[in-house]
């Protein structure tokens, strides 16, 4: 009677290449989101100063 063999998972340790790829990918995604935030902030600031220059808005409170 031959007993069946059960496959056991063997922990080989961390995969350096896999860790580097995951870290690089997460860094690129986080950097992309940061750049999008920065571009949006720049656009809003530019729009504000353009409107201020055209006289559409004012930073001085109106006296009533």
Swiss-Prot record:
Organism lineage string: Eukaryota, Viridiplantae, Streptophyta, Embryophyta, Tracheophyta
Principal location class: mitochondrion
Family: Belongs to the cytochrome c oxidase subunit 5C family.
Species of origin: Ipomoea batatas (Sweet potato)
Protein's name according to its UniProt entry: Cytochrome c oxidase subunit 5C
Gene for this chain: COX5C
Position of the signal peptide: none
UniProt KW Membrane keyword: yes
Function: This protein is one of the nuclear-coded polypeptide chains of cytochrome c oxidase, the terminal oxidase in mitochondrial electron transport.
Highest taxon of the lineage: Eukaryota
Annotated TM spans: 16-34
Subunit details: Sweet potato cytochrome C oxidase consists of at least seven different polypeptides species, subunits I, II, III, IV, Va, Vb, and Vc in order of MW.
Keyword set, alphabetical order: Membrane, Mitochondrion, Mitochondrion inner membrane, Transmembrane, Transmembrane helix
Protein localization: Mitochondrion inner membrane
GO cellular component, one term: mitochondrial inner membrane
Misc remark: This precursor was imported into isolated sweet potato tuberous root mitochondria without any significant processing, the import being dependent on membrane potential.
């Amino acid at each position: 009677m031959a007993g069946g063999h059960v496959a056991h998972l063997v922990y080989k340790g961390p995969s350096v290449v896999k860790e580097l790829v995951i870290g690089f990918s997460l860094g690129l995604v986080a950097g992309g989101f940061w750049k999008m935030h920065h571009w949006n902030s720049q656009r809003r600031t530019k729009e504000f100063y353009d409107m201020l220059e055209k006289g559409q808005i004012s930073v001085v409170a109106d006296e009533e």
